């Protein structure tokens, strides 16, 4: 069955995902989530955003997974889930991304389910 199109909610081909910023490259990451099943996936330090998205979706493992967060070199993404649903945010640090996701969720039941940072 074909994978549905990638849906990206704004916040915010190299053989290896590991390339170096000093060489002028940017690292990319993504967080994917499927609300009904709670499946999730994440990726970080990929050479292209497409590679990061595809790897997060593959890790999520459900054909209905969608990318909820994207982040680039030196940034982090975090996904908080509560009664009102999933909330993904980015930040310059892990603490900032987690705090922003929890504040967006704004529910006592919210908890950060996954996070990732790029180099």
What residue spans do the PLM features occupy?
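Helix-coil modules at protein/domain termini and other flexible surface or pore-lining loops
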Residues: 1-119
């Amino acid at each position: 069955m074909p994978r549905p199109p990638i849906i990206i909610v704004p916040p915010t081909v190299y053989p290896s995902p590991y390339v170096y910023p000093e060489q002028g490259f940017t690292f990319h990451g993504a967080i994917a989530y499927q609300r009904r099943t709670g499946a999730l996936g994440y990726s970080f330090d990929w050479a292209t955003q497409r590679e990061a998205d595809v790897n997060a979706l593959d890790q999520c493992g459900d054909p209905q997974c969608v990318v909820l967060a994207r982040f680039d070199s030196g940034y982090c993404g975090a996904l908080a889930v509560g009664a009102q649903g999933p909330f993904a945010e980015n930040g310059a640090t892990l603490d900032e991304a987690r705090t922003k996701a929890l504040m967006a969720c704004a529910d006592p039941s919210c908890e950060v389910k996954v996070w990732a940072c790029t180099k």
